[in-house]
Amino acid sequence: MSDARAQTLITIAELASLLQGGAPVVLLDVIDEKGAAPEDRPKIPGALSVHLATDFSDKPTKLSGRRPLPKIMDLQANARRWGISRDSQVVVYDSSAGAQASRAWWTFRWAGFRNVRILDGGLAAWTAAGKPTSTDILSEATKAGTVALQAGHMPTIEAQQAARIARSGVLLDARGKAAFVGEAGKPATGHIPGAKLAASGDNIAGGQFRPAAELEAQFAALLGNDGSEVAVYCGSGNAAAHAIAAMHSTGRTPALYVGSWSAWSADPSRPVAQGAEPG
């Protein structure tokens, strides 16, 4: 496994080995508001249930988009409650091929905590490998951590920068094709003019991230090699974080438009393109 991929993803076998060896691993089961309640889903033994909407995001405003970044001190308090210290190894996972876990991974790295990886394949791959699960509902560690976090360690952009990058660089839309194309007669649907469709689902095969060589070829074809500025958005920043994780595994670190389409479309003065072409 390449260094970049190993810094982004952890395999089922690697995690099982760490847990068996007693390594200081903090396991976080990442849930969104549409997912199953903690009591309705099995977990990897010892995993803490965490929520994107409340633990990794601030309260949204009219123009912020659905998933604004958390206040750094709130995130730090949560991380300490989960038992995270500077030397902890954090593994985030979900039951949706990394769609939620990737946003948690990105947020930790944005906050300066780099020793965090996404469990490749998540809970589905864990159970498919015959590994044990638990129904215990845990929300905090038995011993608080001491980690210190600081915002700004991953690149982010706002709407004005997104518009500029769409013209002069590469702006990727990580939503599915239907959302990108939009609906005729509905002006708040479609995409940012100039953006390219790069659905985050294209980075997955069989519930896991595609092999490194496939992702490298995919992104090389999509981005070129002229050094253009690259940024990613989606509906609310989750699928975009998943796409960024995939690119990060190949050594790339594009910027995230955190507000994404939910922020862009909240301002009716902003232009919208519809159809399959960038526009």
Name what the model sees in each region.
Residues 1-279:
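Cytosolic catalytic domains that perform sulfur/thiol-centered chemistry
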